[in-house]
């Protein structure tokens, strides 16, 4: 029982950081520019559900896949660390894109953003998947495994709420 709180804090901080709902928000707003509230809410709902289900699949099947392919947990920890380092390094090297799309292309592209790129890889990327597999491996008791699942659900619920908060234009926004 004494390991439960530190494990829960580790799970929450690592998943909230890797999921990065606050960093995803500007991308979400840019990609859904021109959509109405109903369309944005549907995209947010679909993206968070797909992200949660994808992460649960890897959380429960990760160790089986390791055994099947002969990968050790420690080797995967090292590879996962490199992935997380690369993600962080890429964030430091952010570049502005001058890509322009026609209105028809934007609508076609925006119809699919809930799965790719919003759910996978932004909300449920390789870092989050590696983290879920490793934390499930570390969870030695049923209560720790339940805590991990609950924390993952909590993080995606918070992500859903953060994105939902920004689906409606602000009443103080002069553009609306």
Which stretches of residues belong to each language-model region?
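A small-residue-rich subset of transmembrane alpha-helices
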Residues: 37-63, 139-168
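Juxtamembrane transmembrane-helix termini in multi-pass membrane transport proteins
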Residues: 7-57
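Membrane helix-loop-helix hairpins that form the core translocation module of multi-pass transporters
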Residues: 41-95
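Structural signature of hydrophobic alpha-helical transmembrane segments
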Residues: 10-22, 74-82, 148-159
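Generic transmembrane alpha-helix signature in multi-pass membrane proteins
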Residues: 13-16, 25-32, 116-121, 129-138
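Single conserved hydrophobic/aromatic residue that forms the stacking wall/gate
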Residues: 166, 171-176
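Interfacial loop-to-helix junctions that mark the boundaries of transmembrane helices
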Residues: 2-5, 68-77, 140-150
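Small-residue-enriched transmembrane helix starts and helix-helix packing motifs
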Residues: 1-17, 94-95, 101-119
